[in-house]
């Protein structure tokens, strides 16, 4: 049974039927579809469009279908065009002809737009929850490992930071991601139900009522836009892509830091895998997969942008292609956030190797230049002097702090005994604005 066909002389080909069906993926929307129908039916009786006893039968049937799906009694499968026809046809089979009144004053165009918005809201809230859990772990692990480590530019050791402060940089990225998602929730918080196919309805339906019942701030202002808007899907996948970019950057650093060349951290066994041929291997596959899946979410974004780029108003069947990219991007970002939280919460940090890398990288060179500036030398001259000292140290295979005062004075008479305290790593990280890094 189809929800349409009266104006057709010939049957739809089986090839076209299969090609047209979206049930295999839009079945994810069964909960939202039924909840939207429940709200619609309650509105219909309030507006005296259907009778009270009809409403009761329809609501009971919808609630039974929802329960049967949740309990696995009713399988979402079969020869149905989409989740909307699956629910409606099963309702009619369950309660009889009164079920045919469910769709009064409604189109599948506003129905699917509603389903997707409800699903997008729920999905976004789930992503925000996962972000918060990851941010909590970053703070906790950072506070437990507030060790001095090299900070990098161009992947070259640059200045001293702390492991905690480095993790907090990612905390800031994810905090921005959370703000972006909350802003997106506010923008999409308008109900399209009641927009009809594109031009509303001749029935005096109450869009304000259904919007409130379904948790929306208000109904959409324009029917055409209500059924054809997919901006919120594009916006959310775009924001998911930024989250994935942040996760990928963090993954890259974790992969580097866990390598034998760095040995700053150990990734827990629970988030690593081995080699089928090399018994000694412990691979950071969790982080590598997150890094790889970032491109997958980018692909979802480009896919939906391409679908929407040339569509005239209002609804077009092209828009059926909005669901799989969104479902995939949402599932991917949630799984990656959960895995990253697991990786972070089980990290082991090698304090000694962090400090060894600090000692080898002339990470107090900027502070040594600042010392000369404080003694009256122009910064550009101080920069040159310290650069010459670094060359001298490299030739001697020593650090700046290992040079004697006599050696330092070969480069400038401004050096005094207090230079050693000034360029001490633990001391320098608590000078000036560096105190904001919170080393303790």
Swiss-Prot record:
CDD domains (alphabetical)? Argininosuccinate_lyase
Which GO BP terms apply?
arginine biosynthetic process via ornithine; L-arginine biosynthetic process
Q: Which domain of life is it from?
A: Bacteria
User: Which pathway does the database say it acts in?
Assistant: Amino-acid biosynthesis; L-arginine biosynthesis; L-arginine from L-ornithine and carbamoyl phosphate: step 3/3
Keywords in UniProt for this one?
Amino-acid biosynthesis, Arginine biosynthesis, Cytoplasm, Lyase
The protein's matches in SUPFAM superfamilies, at most eight in alphabetical order, are given as: L-aspartase-like
EC id: 4.3.2.1
Kindly report, in one word, the top-level EC class recorded for this enzyme: lyase
Instruction: List the subcellular locations.
Output: Cytoplasm
The protein, known as? Argininosuccinate lyase
Q: Which organism is it from?
A: Clostridium botulinum (strain Langeland / NCTC 10281 / Type F)
What gene is it encoded by?
A: argH
